Amino acid sequence: MAMKIRLARGGSKKRPHYAIVASDSRMPRDGRFIEKLGTYNPLLPKDSEDRIKMNLERVQYWLGQGAQPTDRVARFLEAAGVKEKAERKNLKKGEPGKAAKERAEKRAAREAAANAPAEEAASE
């Protein structure tokens, strides 16, 4: 059985509240779970103690049993000091898009054309 430690959404529309659960990866997101390990309330301020609550002993037990945390839960565990911080690489994140590259090329060509006659006139 492939285990995951993940978020199960609760709360009402536009008012999310999540339970941190250990569940079988084949079960639905909000469906059956094996154990509730904590809660996460994204509506609270980031510095609030009640924003993320976890039973770290049980989390470590499930990690020892081979449960894989999802990306968001892994970040929570890194912040709590349970898991080592994974290095993330978004190499394409900062790269400009296709249209921006084309605009930059056109701008560079225009500037080169504008500077070329001025340089020739200055050298004569």
UniProtKB/Swiss-Prot annotation:
> What keywords were assigned to this record?
Ribonucleoprotein, Ribosomal protein
SUPFAM superfamilies in alphabetical order: Ribosomal protein S16
Which cellular component, as a GO term, is one annotated location? Answer: cytoplasm
Q: Is Ribosomal protein one of the keywords UniProt gives this record?
A: yes
Q: What are this entry's molecular-function GO terms?
A: structural constituent of ribosome
Q: Which InterPro entries match?
A: Ribosomal_bS16, Ribosomal_bS16_dom_sf
Where are stretches of biased composition, namely Basic and acidic residues? 84-110
Disordered: annotated segments: 84-124
- Top-rank taxon of the source lineage equals Bacteria
**What is one GO biological process annotated to this record?**
translation
Pfam families, per database record: Ribosomal_S16
- Spans of biased composition, class Low complexity? 111-124
Instruction: Provide the family line.
Output: Belongs to the bacterial ribosomal protein bS16 family.
- Check the record and name the PANTHER family matching this protein: 30S RIBOSOMAL PROTEIN S16 (PTHR12919), SMALL RIBOSOMAL SUBUNIT PROTEIN BS16M (PTHR12919:SF20)
Question: Which HAMAP family does the UniProt entry name for this protein?
Answer: Ribosomal_bS16
This one is known as: Small ribosomal subunit protein bS16
The gene is rpsP
